[in-house]
């Protein structure tokens, strides 16, 4: 009986991408806490930061004002998205030299399916090492790589030896690795879900696997089924070339109708900042802003505006006020 060979999946994640580009291009920023994102006197957030800034507790999506309080000596710079996009395309060109099965996740990370690549003695680990070396040669930037037999484990592996590191999780190691993995390290499980799982007595992959499909579905809905499969070492998601996030959004439902214009504007402003933070986390940019309002009778009104340049927190808030 013929069986499909185990897949070989590589996850490449650039190291502190936006900040690394700025430190590469501006030597005065090197070896210093550098923050790319909103300025400290704005309501913006940290898009990414250098490892020097991370060492003092600053992280992505943190309000820039808080980052400034933590480290007043930090250097704050606005993102240069056109530059990042150009470099990202250079990196993707490197990927395509090895395989056409490349799934970009954001400007600075991607999955590669190298199952059928015969070079490097059929070793995905040696291949990943060659890819990261070539990226360094062409861009003077470092990347970390995770290698495994599915996307979930490859993603987890790429974070283990950051920065400028590589880690492989073999099929023989996979089940034990997942059993021992703290639930907060599972990709896709954020602080709120982690807290809920802890309340259910789930702290590791092994404890997660003890719950049935029905139990996980009752607590987490459709996502619970994904958790079930991951906990049981089942992740058959294919690498999909050219698949990118097309939109991000947030919404708020009130317990009763509101008409206070100040409250409406404050709420829309908070929702925008939350959506903008998602963009920053995914290292994406947006050109169109949409506001959707649903009334008690379920009538829905939508207003959109497309900007002439990528949306920043200042442009977005101004557009929100205009649309309202």
Regions found by a protein language model. Name each.
Residues 4, 11, 185, 193-321:
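DNA-contacting surface of Y-family translesion DNA polymerases
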Residues 1-219, 223-225, 239:
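Gly/Gly-Pro- and Ser/Thr-rich, intrinsically disordered tail segments characteristic of DNA damage-repair
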């Amino acid at each position: 009986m013929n069986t499909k060979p185990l897949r070989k999946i590589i996850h490449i994640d650039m190291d502190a991408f936006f900040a690394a580009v700025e430190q590469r291009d501006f030597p005065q920023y090197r070896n210093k806490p550098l923050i790319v994102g909103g300025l400290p006197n704005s309501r913006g957030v940290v898009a990414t930061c250098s490892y020097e800034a991370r060492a003092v507790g600053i992280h992505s999506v943190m309000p820039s004002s808080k980052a400034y309080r933590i480290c007043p000596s930090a250097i704050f710079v606005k993102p240069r998205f056109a530059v990042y996009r150009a470099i990202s395309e250079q990196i993707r060109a490197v990927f395509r030299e090895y395989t056409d099965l490349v799934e970009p996740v954001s400007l600075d990370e991607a999955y590669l399916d190298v199952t059928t690549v015969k070079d490097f003695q059929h070793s995905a680990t040696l291949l990943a090492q060659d890819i990261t070396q070539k990226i360094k040669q062409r861009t003077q930037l470092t990347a970390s790589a995770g290698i495994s037999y599915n996307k979930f484990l490859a993603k987890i592996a790429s974070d283990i030896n950051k920065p400028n590191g590589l880690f492989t999780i073999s099929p023989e190691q996979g089940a034990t690795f997942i059993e021992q993995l703290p639930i907060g390290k599972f990709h896709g499980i954020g602080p709120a879900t982690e807290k809920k799982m802890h309340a259910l007595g789930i702290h590791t992959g092994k404890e997660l696997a003890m719950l049935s499909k029905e139990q996980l579905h009752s607590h987490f809905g459709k996502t619970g089924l994904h958790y079930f499969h991951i906990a049981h070492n089942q992740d058959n998601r294919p690498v999909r070339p050219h698949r990118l996030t097309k939109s991000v959004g947030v919404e708020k439902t009130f317990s009763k109708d509101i008409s206070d214009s100040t409250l409406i504007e404050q709420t829309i402003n908070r929702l925008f900042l939350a959506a903008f933070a998602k963009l920053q986390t995914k290292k994406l940019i947006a050109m169109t802003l949409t506001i959707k309002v649903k009334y008690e009778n379920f009538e829905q009104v939508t207003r959109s505006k497309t900007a002439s340049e990528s949306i920043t927190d200042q442009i977005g808030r101004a557009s929100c006020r205009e649309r309202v």
